[in-house]
């Protein structure tokens, strides 16, 4: 399955300490990594590089430019009316893995 991960796409982190939190893709680093931000003041996700296998894209997208600052991302999320959606935490789908298989 090919994931549609482009700039401005809202994603859910499925692995790591921020699992279940939503973030926005700010830049595509290469075929395996993207740069995401919550921003931290909105969702608790700091700007960081993550493996695309650790995120799951949603059907939501905000209009931002490549490398947008946290302030620009917040304005775009507010303009799209997604503030409450971004603050919601979800139970991440573990992509078919059992808890014992996740290390």
Swiss-Prot record:
SUPFAM superfamilies documented for this protein: Translation proteins SH3-like domain (SSF50104)
Any one cellular-component term (Gene Ontology): cytosolic large ribosomal subunit
Keyword Ribonucleoprotein belongs to the record: yes
GO MF entry, a single one: RNA binding
Keyword line: Ribonucleoprotein, Ribosomal protein
An annotated GO BP: translation
InterPro entries: Rib_uL2_dom2 (IPR014722), Ribosomal_eL14 (IPR039660), Ribosomal_eL14_arc (IPR023651), Ribosomal_eL14_KOW (IPR041985), Translation_prot_SH3-like_sf (IPR008991)
CDD domains referenced in this protein's UniProt entry, alphabetically: KOW_RPL14
Family: Belongs to the eukaryotic ribosomal protein eL14 family.
Protein name in the entry: Large ribosomal subunit protein eL14
Species assigned in the record: Pyrobaculum arsenaticum (strain DSM 13514 / JCM 11321 / PZ6)
């Amino acid at each position: 399955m090919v994931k549609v991960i482009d700039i401005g796409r809202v994603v859910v982190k499925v692995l790591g300490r921020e699992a279940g939190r939503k973030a926005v893709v700010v830049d595509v680093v290469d075929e395996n990594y993207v740069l995401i931000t919550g921003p931290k003041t909105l969702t608790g996700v700091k700007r960081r590089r993550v493996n695309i296998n650790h995120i799951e894209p949603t059907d939501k997208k905000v209009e931002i430019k490549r490398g947008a600052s946290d302030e620009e991302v917040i304005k775009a999320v507010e303009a799209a009316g997604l503030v409450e959606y971004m603050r919601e935490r979800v139970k991440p789908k573990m992509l078919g893995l059992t808890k014992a298989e996740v290390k």
